[in-house]
Regions:
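Conserved AAA+ ATPase core "coupling" helix
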Residues: 1-49
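C-terminal helical "lid" of AAA+/P-loop NTPase domains
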Residues: 5, 32, 45-52, 67-81
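Short hinge/gating elements
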Residues: 17, 25-37, 55-60, 105-113
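C-terminal engagement/docking regions of AAA+ P-loop ATPases
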Residues: 56-137
Length: 137
């Protein structure tokens, strides 16, 4: 049965053909707009503290790397853009933190023994890092 399901996916359904909603030029323009989204220093510090806390938490053997922090910053700016703002708020970071960080960390033996999921540990990290109030320019 599984083989038939997988093989059946080879057939192209005319209704499933996707049409582009923007062209490459428009996409590059949006990318430039996202890069210009403002992040206050307090918001940068919040993002960095969240990521740093994953590197010092005893339940995490390997936390979010500096590259992961940069990815979180970029995605947070994109989230702000999608919400129609030209600045990042803590909620933008919170909205995507679990998704960005969960697959980047390695749980410690202690966390595995306690059957703690990456998500539950990250929620605890978020609860223990003070959120800033500054966001706008």
């Amino acid at each position: 049965m599984k083989l038939q399901i997988v093989k059946g996916r080879q057939i192209q359904d005319d209704k499933a053909v996707l049409q582009p909603v923007i062209n490459a030029e428009q996409l590059l323009y949006c990318k430039k707009l996202v890069e210009q989204i403002y992040m206050a220093d307090d918001i940068y510090r919040y993002l960095c503290e969240l990521c740093q806390t994953t590197r010092t938490n005893p339940l995490i053997e390997l936390g979010v790397s500096p590259r992961g922090s940069v990815a979180l910053m970029r995605i947070s700016k994109a989230i702000a853009f999608l919400h129609g703002r030209d600045y990042v708020i803590p909620g933008d970071i919170d909205e995507i933190f679990l998704d960005v960080a969960a697959h980047r960390l390695v749980r410690s033996a202690k966390a595995k023994a306690a059957k703690r999921s990456a998500e539950s540990i990250l929620i605890e990290v978020m609860q223990n890092v003070k959120k800033p109030t500054a966001a706008r320019r």
